[in-house]
Amino acid sequence: DAIVDSSARPVLYSVFQQKQDAASYRALLGEAAGKIRAARTIMDSSNTANDRAALARRALTPDERLDNRVETAAAIRLLNEASSTLMDMAGSSGFAESSLAQQYWRDFNVGSRHVIFNAYVSNEAFGTSVLGRAQEILPADCV
């Protein structure tokens, strides 16, 4: 919202009286919004699978848990890219301590680096599964 709200401001040192008049600004906004939407779609799908298992009173299978891990890693990657793009659009003022955009960006970047979201391990485990190899990367209760 902060980015959209600032779209009426000028692009300094350019001919654009409003940021939204610049095609590059609109393209970046569209790219970031598309990544946020894709991440939401991924997580909605993952949550639906979790809800179905819970309603059936069954634990997720190892394959379903791997799906959750790799899909969450993909969603986090998309959101990380989107938040970085939005901060680029906000410019240096977006990083002011008083800026909500900076606070959200910082909190997301710290939280997304929690060990449970380790994309490298999740992607390696999923790749191992795709190859049909024995799962030796994650303990069974962590898959």
Where are these regions (language model features)?
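Extended amphipathic alpha-helical segments enriched in small hydrophobics
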Residues: 1-52
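Generic non-transmembrane alpha-helical segments
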Residues: 2, 78-85
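Generic detector of well-ordered alpha-helical segments enriched in charged/polar residues
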Residues: 4, 26, 47, 65, ...
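Charge-rich, acidic-biased intrinsically disordered regions
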Residues: 15-21, 52-69, 94-110, 138-139
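Alpha-helical structural motif
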Residues: 25-28, 35, 42, 71, ...
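Generic structural signal for well-ordered, non-transmembrane alpha-helical segments
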Residues: 30-37, 69, 73-80, 106-109, ...
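C-terminal helix-coil-helix/basic helical segment that borders enzyme active sites and/or dimer interfaces
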Residues: 38-74, 84-95
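Glycine-rich phosphate/cofactor-binding loops in nucleotide/flavin-utilizing enzymes
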Residues: 92-143
